[in-house]
Amino acid sequence: MAAQGFLLIASFLLILLVLAKPLGSGLARLIAAVPLPGVAGVERILWRTLGITDHEMNWRQYLLALLTLNLLGLGILFCLLFWQEWLPLNPQRLPGLSWDLALNTAVSFVTNTNWQAYSGESTLSHFSQMAGLTVQNFLSAATGIAVVFALIRAFTRQNVHTLGNAWQDLVRITLWILFPVALIIALFFIQQGVPQNLSAYQPITTLEGAKQLLPMGPVASQEAIKMLGTNGGGFFNANSSHPFENPTALTNLAQMLAIFLIPAALCFAFGEAAGDRRQGRALLWAMSFIFVVCVAVVMWAEVQGNPHLLAAGADSSVNMEGKETRFGVLASSLFAVVTTAASCGAVNAMHDSFTALGGMVPMWLMQIGEVVFGGVGSGLYGMLLFVLLAVFIAGLMIGRTPEYLGKKIDVREMKMTALAILVTPMLVLLGSALAMMTDAGRSAMLNPGPHGFSEVLYAVSSAANNNGSAFAGLSANSPFWNCLLAFCMFVGRFGVIIPVMAIAGSLVSKKVQPASQGTLATHGALFIGLLIGTVLLVGALTFIPALALGPVAEHFSLP
């Protein structure tokens, strides 16, 4: 079993690197604002049609453009969901969502979280899925990538005040990266058996003679961008454990690769844009090391099995509870770590049914800020925040002003870095405390003791870090939970983006200093170790007390 697990991990990472490197070169061209081959003429027509100029923006203008787009999308999506019953392509005549659920869902998809407090097949029409959720899957992914483009330009430019044109970046990212890759993935899913239609639900008679209603809809198109954009919101309630979303072992592998594809490619793009590919590889090595260790721990925990089930006479020594037999324990464990290392949140198994330690690792990966590959764009700019913190710590140890890629890291950058890193831990800890202190929060818990607290902690961690997965034993569709998690999702997204853009605005105006003998090399094994240590240290100091009350206490309570 151990050999199979490591072979699965190695094969997955090898295929990922082969696919990510050429995509990284394309992303690097977009960072440099160089049109991809053959599309320059198309872009000129688009700019004239859309009224987009070549005028570059400073960080405030760039940020304002992104906030305007996202707030407008939030309002439109809320209206689509709230008045769903009056809109077309609703063959099941599903009613509109309540105001709190519509708000929660709109915030969720605009912030790239895709937390779902509803069952998709019994709540949303085809129109809501296509015109509402799928559109936001593209726009939220493009927003994250645009932010990291601006931050990368801040390191590669000097003595200027502009970071590019947000509207051009958003259009290029959507049309030349997200759409074509998502189209290829969607066609593959259709070939594998994923539905893509606008039909009403189909009544059938099962082998036992019972009547059943099979949900239909444009599943493949939404599934593709759901994974590629690290969105994660399922067309069906069971998400990627549903055979209509993830029917085969091949689609399961393709979904995991799609989740990591752009985050890994952005590391290569960062190295090319910085003029030193070793810089991007260093970040990729750091992410990969943490990822492999986490996958190994989850696989080990799930292979050990659940003592309660073993004592009850379960016919399997491994923990197959909540897992699909067509995937098995190893592929389910790998998927769980992939989806929580990235801010995706799609699931092919129920994380609530994992062992205590097996469920703790995905929770902790979210809590450290979704920086192990992370979401599209957000993972890299989150890791770059830890890079700035690591060079600051190194500068304190050797008595030098910290710098990264030749840019001096001053007080302003460190204040913004600290703010961005502290936003999500504060939301997680304060939000969990509020839920446990109120009757409205506790009433949603379906399990007592440490596991019940773990469900609450997981939900708030998922929302604040824009992941979207859940320990399903929490009845979260209530005004209290919908409003609390909507607030966490919104602040967790834009409360990080705003200081990141402020850092970019500060760095882009600085001169690149030539390296000297005392300059810390940020591409070697020493710095990779320092970066990993910084990520682990922040995660450990912040969340060990909370984890001790939840999954750790649950683990030690097992026989």
UniProtKB/Swiss-Prot annotation:
Q: Which residues cross the membrane?
A: 5-25, 27-47, 63-83, 132-152, 170-190, 253-273, 283-303, 327-347, 356-376, 379-399, 416-436, 484-504, 524-544
Q: Where in the cell is it found?
A: Cell inner membrane
Q: Name one GO molecular function term.
A: P-type potassium transmembrane transporter activity
Pfam families registered for this protein in UniProt: KdpA (PF03814)
Regarding protein family, the annotation reads: Belongs to the KdpA family.
Question: Quaternary structure per UniProt?
Answer: The system is composed of three essential subunits: KdpA, KdpB and KdpC.
Q: What does this protein do?
A: Part of the high-affinity ATP-driven potassium transport (or Kdp) system, which catalyzes the hydrolysis of ATP coupled with the electrogenic transport of potassium into the cytoplasm. This subunit binds the periplasmic potassium ions and delivers the ions to the membrane domain of KdpB through an intramembrane tunnel.
Q: Which NCBIfam families match?
A: kdpA
Q: What is this protein called?
A: Potassium-transporting ATPase potassium-binding subunit
This protein's species is: Salmonella choleraesuis (strain SC-B67)
Q: State the gene name recorded for this protein.
A: kdpA
